[in-house]
């Protein structure tokens, strides 16, 4: 019995040492699958950090980093997210979860259809880029997007605010109206239009040209949980 107790105690010590190494030591290729210690000081590193998190999420190995009360206290005085994501309001697209990131890591802007065609949304994008200094900004479209579905549908009219929203999206994907079988292509194209809209602002384009920022289109597969970026 004493030997078993000593063995269990030694196991607990080793587990504690492993967790300490995970939180304190620089990441190696083998460690990144368990720990989220990747740097995000450059746009390329920031994107790699997001994609590594999504790989963990898809594999069912999410570690939910920086999500405890200590992180709440750390970020209370200020925020310094390394990434920004313009995502959809859809409840199936939980940005921090699908990238396996924590509190204060991602500045998230969610609108129906991940639409950037308004001053208020672009103001939020500017805030992320100019004031918070995010290194990467993704426009994240997703499969089965209701906003794009409604926008390209024929024979079904919405009125009021919803109708206005769908009309805005429809203007960005006119070639797909009436082509329900091309929904996925329409979703991806719509996200591309939003990226182009953001890059049309000179101050954003300048940061990209200087290598200080990446602005990319991304797509979230609601069936697999996987994010692809192009």
Which residues are covered by each model-predicted region?
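Catalytic core of membrane glycerolipid acyltransferases/transacylases, capturing the structured
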Residues: 92-109
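Bacterial N-terminal signal peptides that target proteins for export
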Residues: 1-9
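Bacterial N-terminal signal peptides
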Residues: 10-20
């Amino acid at each position: 019995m004493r030997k078993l107790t000593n063995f269990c105690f030694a196991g607990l010590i080793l587990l504690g040492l492993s967790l300490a190494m995970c939180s304190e030591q620089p990441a190696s290729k083998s460690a990144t699958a368990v720990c989220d210690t990747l740097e995000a000081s450059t746009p390329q590193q920031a994107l790699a950090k997001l994609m590594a998190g999504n790989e963990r999420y898809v594999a069912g190995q999410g570690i939910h980093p920086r999500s405890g009360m200590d992180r709440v206290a750390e970020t209370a005085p200020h925020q310094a997210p390394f990434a920004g994501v313009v995502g959809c309001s859809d409840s199936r697209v939980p940005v921090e979860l699908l990238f396996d990131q924590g509190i204060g890591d991602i500045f998230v802007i969610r609108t129906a259809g991940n639409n950037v065609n308004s001053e208020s949304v672009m103001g939020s994008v500017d805030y992320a880029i100019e004031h918070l200094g995010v290194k990467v900004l993704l426009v994240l479209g997703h499969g089965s997007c209701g906003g794009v579905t409604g926008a390209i549908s024929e024979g079904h009219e919405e009125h009021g605010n919803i109708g206005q929203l769908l009309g805005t999206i429809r203007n960005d994907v006119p070639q797909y109206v009436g082509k329900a079988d091309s929904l996925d292509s329409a979703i991806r194209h719509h996200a591309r239009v939003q990226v182009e809209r953001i890059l049309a602002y000179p101050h954003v384009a300048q940061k990209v040209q200087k290598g200080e920022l990446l602005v990319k289109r991304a797509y979230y597969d609601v069936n697999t949980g996987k994010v692809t970026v192009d």
